Each structure stands twice: as structure tokens, then as C-alpha cells.
Amino acid sequence: MARGPQTLVQVWVGGQLFQADRALLVEHCGFFRGLFRSGMRETRAAEVRLGVLSAGGFRATLQVLRGDRPALAAEDELLQAVECAAFLQAPALARFLEHNLTSDNCALLCDAAAAFGLRDVFHSAALFICDGERELAAELALPEARAYVAALRPSSYAAVSTHTPAPGFLEDASRTLCYLDEEEDAWRTLAALPLEASTLLAGVATLGNKLYIVGGVRGASKEVVELGFCYDPDGGTWHEFPSPHQPRYDTALAGFDGRLYAIGGEFQRTPISSVERYDPAAGCWSFVADLPQPAAGVPCAQACGRLFVCLWRPADTTAVVEYAVRTDAWLPVAELRRPQSYGHCMVAHRDSLYVVRNGPSDDFLHCAIDCLNLATGQWTALPGQFVNSKGALFTAVVRGDTVYTVNRMFTLLYAIEGGTWRLLREKAGFPRPGSLQTFLLRLPPGAPGPVTSTTAEL
């Protein structure tokens, strides 16, 4: 939204003078909103003095409110930012901290957020710790933080294979969501798909720990299923919701910033560029900015609270673009040119995007991975080749510092470290044939589901 002329206010913090847009402070900070609307004598003065905050923390606050992305790495920088987010009641700064959680700072942020009463940051940091290695929880200093993390359940790697709607009279036990039980090294059944649901060429994504399925097809004519389906693991229930206005299949679905995005896709065998956004609270879809070009099945990923997709362009080019919510526009980020090779899968870790691309001459068995650092804009090729047996690399999902991939033979876990993906351990393969869509879900406590039965390949 366009702003009018700025009214600057001078703010003294930690012995330093800052000039800030008054409207920006009122919009994003509950403290200033209350202060300027109170009619107190201080609000009519030329200056506001904040004696309890640090200059560094307030500087970071202003940077975030203006849309910048300050690098907060040192402990004192993080602590000062948490203090400012809590005192100034600045949700945008709190979200920035949540989006930049790493295994290096999660324990510090969890303790600090607990001490300052920053509930959302505390909860997000606790979830991150729960999904990471056990040593992370040991770094917590506050007993209440350790107890909170101990009461949480880690996310489970889950998958669904390709299924079309089933006739009501024909029960198909293979039409299920499944999850990996890492302790027992077995895939277990989580829930049966609704009879009308199709995962063939569907968009699948999670948002708010719920699974959404949009745009599957039935039949050789690729008739689009009319409804979307949402699974809530906490209640073990499905509910239906409207499909996008533009019928589409092979769409990329992303849960981002509290909304669901259906990105591109295909209809009547023609790629489309339109993008729609679903508001779960309102229960309706609305169009947002089109992709720069028509595209189906585009890889997408989120890093640092930002949404990215890969597009293919002539001359062996994979282009990474970002959706800017504030301006409703797709912005170019970077391009990667490799002979006869394009990005087919993209995942995010910290401030980097990892693009998995085929080898030359349509070699999909031996893939390469390139890393785009968003802070520097530089590409780095991971050393060696990665075996992509039965498309396992295209099922990649990141949890903490670990990449999960799966096919019929095994589930492989990789540690992201030292500029590469190091094979960490091997688990059971998915026991059913077909292309897989994978995701993370946090499952409620209770008896584990039955071990998933094996279905023979046709």
C-alpha cells in the first residue's frame, strides 16, 4: 500500500538518535501506537526517549519494519532483538526472528523469548529444537523451556502415493497417507484418503500442521476434481474446501504466511501462469500476480520467511523467482545455466536454496545439486553426483539440518553440513509403488498406526 508523506519522529535509544517514520512505528509497534494515541505530553514533544532498550536492537527493529533483512548472528544482537520485539510489541520483528531460527541460535532464542514473554518466538524455537538433534535441548538454560520442549512431539516424514478417486463400492486399502516411524524403522498408515480425493497431478502442501490436497485429476481426459481436501492430524478428520477459481492440475501448492498458494499448473493440457491464494479463515480463493511465464509442476521452497519457485527457460536456464507479498509481484532472484539440465526439486535450509537438477542428456539417475546463498546471491555446486534412484531426490524434505528422501527401496537421510549433503542413515523404503508426494506433519500422541502393507508394482 502506498504511503503518504512521512512524518518523522526522533527517538533516543541507548544514547543514539534515530529518525523514524511515525506512521511506520504506529502500524507495526503496539508500544508506539498506544503512546501516540494516548495524548500524553511526551507524544507532543519533538523527541521520544526509550531508556530501557539498546541502540542495536532498535536499529534492527527499524530495518525489519522497512523491509530489510539484518544479519543477526551474535548473541547480543539476538537478545537485543528479542527485547525490542517484546517491549515495542512488534510482531514483524518477532516473525523475522522465527523465520531465521537455526540450530546455532534456537536455544538462545527459546530461552530469551521465554524470559521476555515473546510467546510465538518461544513456541517456534521450541518446535525447531524438538525437530533437531537431542543436543539442542541440552543447551536450554531455563527449566520451563526444557519442560516445554520435552512435552512436544517432533514432526514426522509423511508421504502419499498417486491415487485417483475410488468408486464407492470398491475399497482400496492402499489409498492412505503414511508416515515414517523412525524408532521402529517402518512406514505406518496414518489415514485413508476420502473416496473423492485424487493425488494424481495434485498439489499437496501443509499449512498450520494440516495437509491440503488441491487439483487432482480423474480419468484419461484429466478431469479436475471439483473439491479440495484438508486433513487435520490432531482430530484425525478430513474436510472439504473449495477449489481455485481456475481449474488446474499439476499445480505447485505452498502453505506460506498463513495462506495457501496454488501456483501455475495446467488445464486442458495447456500450462497456465495464474496464481491463486486461499485464506483458510475466510474459506475463499483470490487471484494474485501471475507467474512471469506459464508453468506446471514448478519446484517451490521457503527460506527466511520468503517464497521461491523455479522456472525453466530456453538455453538451459533454471530461473529462481520470489513472490513479494507487499507488492504482489514475482521478482527475479537468480539464474543457473547448465547444459541440458534443469531444476526439478528445490528445498531450503537456513538462508540457502538447494536445487536438484538432472544430469546431461536427460540423465535422471545421476543428479547434481546446486546451492544458492540468498545473502550473497552466489551459486555453489555440491561436490560429486547424487544417485536419484526411482526419483528419491525429488521427494526431498528438510527437517532441521536433515534432508529426508524416499523411494521403494529405502529412505535416506542426509545431514546438511560442510557445503554438501552427507549420508546420515538409511531407513525402510516406502512399501507402495507410484510417484510420491512428501511432507512433514506433527502427529498427536497415541497408539501408532498399523504398519503399511506392501503393494506390488504393476
Curated annotation (Swiss-Prot):
Binding partners and assembly: Component of the BCR(KBTBD13) E3 ubiquitin ligase complex, at least composed of CUL3 and KBTBD13 and RBX1. Interacts with CUL3.
Annotated compartments: Cytoplasm
Kelch repeats: 159-209, 210-258, 259-305, 307-350, 352-400
Highest classification ranks of the organism: Eukaryota, Metazoa, Chordata, Craniata, Vertebrata
Medical condition linked: Nemaline myopathy 6: A form of nemaline myopathy characterized by childhood onset of slowly progressive proximal muscle weakness, exercise intolerance, and slow movements with stiff muscles. Patients are unable to run or correct themselves from falling over.
Tissue spec: Expressed in skeletal muscle.
Job of this protein: Substrate-specific adapter of a BCR (BTB-CUL3-RBX1) E3 ubiquitin ligase complex.
UniProt-recorded name of the protein: Kelch repeat and BTB domain-containing protein 13
Pfam family, one: BTB
